[in-house]
Amino acid sequence: MIDVSRGRFVPKSATAYVILPGKIVLFAIGKFPRIPTPIMKRIIVGTAGHIDHGKTSLVKALTGVDADRLKEEKERGITIDIGFADLTVGDVHFGFVDVPGHERFVKNMLAGAHGIDLVTLVVAADESVMPQTREHFDICRLLKVKSGLVVITKADLVDEELLQLVEAEVADFVAGSFLEGAPVLRVSSRTGVGVDELKKTLSRLAARARERDENAVARLPIDRSFTIKGFGTVVTGTLIAGRIRAGDELEILPPVSSSGPAPGRRARARGLQVHGKSTQEALAGERVAINLQGIDLAEVERGQTLAPAGRLRTSSMLDARLRLLGSAPRGLRARSRVRLHIGAAEVLARVVPLGRMELAPGDSCFAQLRLETPTLALPGDHFIVRAYSPVVTIGGGVVIDALPSKHRLREAAQAASWLEKLEAADEVERVALLVEMAGERGMDQDEIAARSGSSNEVIKRAAEAVTKARRAVTASPPPKTALTPLVARPAFEELAGRVRSTLKEFHRKSPLESGMGREEIREKIFAHLPPDIFRAVIANLVERNEIVAEKDLLRLSSHRVALSAEEQAAKDRLAALFAEAGLQPMPLEDAIAQSGVDTARAQRFAQMLINSGELVRVAGLVFHRSAIDGLRETLRKFKAEHGPKLDVTAFKDLTGVSRKYAIPLLEYLDLQRVTRRSGDVREILL
């Protein structure tokens, strides 16, 4: 291994290398060795606490790794940026995220605090609870960290009486929080007292920690990026969901300097390392270093997220449940500018509380966060809000809808009601609500994944549940795909009703017409919708016997064309005129004049014959169906006797028609796939 944090030369004899924070492991290009390790539970542990309370020393005492990697950190003896270490205890692999304690570096602390499973709240025995202890602990509560413990460090520096006093202060400090009743351990990183007990306690807590979803859409918030000459760009972060494999095509979202939602920059995962070991696959809950192929370092920065290409979308607005800390210096007025920390990103935003003009300290409400630059978020993601100036932590919350529309003032009550439903929804109900929100456009599986982050398996189960409950309709016949829209039943039925009413009005105005053109209905009602939805609505109405589909025509099942004896005779006369003409068609105007009825009715009869297929339009000509069918049979016999090839001259000789009719007929036959043109020759396909 070679230390890259100090910029040492990489030997040219190396064939290739995979990089992890601070190190390089050499191996052959194109080969990603699988490290055979037993299945372990993966837990991310974050430190929290005031500056100089011994967080980094504690991590080193546990793991043997000095998480301070910067020269300035070592010179000044304080942590400035996040650091990492790992430890295996039994069947649990711990990844430690060591965060800075100084108030100036809280934004760095926030970049590392996302995705932790357990928090180790560090309190120095010689100082007890201090300002950054409080702010870090507020952040952990706002991020909804569920479990952890308290470590009283520097226990060797004070007497028993003071230790007991600090323990009492700590107990009072965490009362009513997730750390109430949690283990409180005395540790000396210098002497090693309490370190073994700390490892055992972490193992017990890990056993109760919730497993992450390895099948959800993968997301890796980038907290560090760097490059190695001759090798490329490397990013690191905690994989908070899903899995990433060597060779995967990934997308970095949002793109650098993006002013609005836009596709990300794509790259391929050339190599992976998890906790210092080369691997083919990284799973949720692991610290990962990824060498990216096809992207420059200038296109990567802290705060972006790595995800599977094309699966997720960034947004400039987030709907959320926002809570203001009771310790916030003042209320948060509508459109206040704040610093939003989500994942590893810091984004400036305006807060718009829904249904109120101000959020008071200690209160919560639904709010829309309008971002000045886009970010990637999903429902369930927790965030921190810090005041724009002075920069202090004032609150936080959870994302409910990551791709909302902009809410106007008059829509606030409706938006809040919608968010209340989403907030309480389980995975099935969320799919149902998202599809309901999509209205008549519906929502396909990929769109649902982009709005929820759920795995395809979860979405498929949820979609089956809502269709079985008749809350939605799958807008496609089998086989269904990820792009098959799911339409809420009320919206689907509304479209079906519009088809029925459109046909009813058509039949009222044109009682002698057999039906309305399928394409005309599509353009009138479905032009702005995916084609699958049009096909599904029509198929559903036909299945319910409410409409009849006859070739390219649609009609209500109840519609019948009733002609008088005189009208039927005129219609039959028109058909007979074209049948007698064969492949030497008479002009339509001449046939109408000979029909025996007025021009308007004769034109309707001709259109009825065309709609029913008895007459066939070929360019500007009209032929009887029997003539076209006879032509097909003539071509079939010609092919059997003379082979499949014929030119225009042979076609004219075969049919007895002039070039005036031969060319349109041949072009029609090409469209019907009866013939296929190749230069001046046709091939008979029958």
Predicted regions and their residues:
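C-terminal effector modules of nucleic-acid-centric enzymes and ribosome-associated factors
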Residues: 158-162, 172, 275, 295-617, ...
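Short hydrophobic alpha-helical segments enriched in small aliphatic residues
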Residues: 4, 10, 18, 25-28
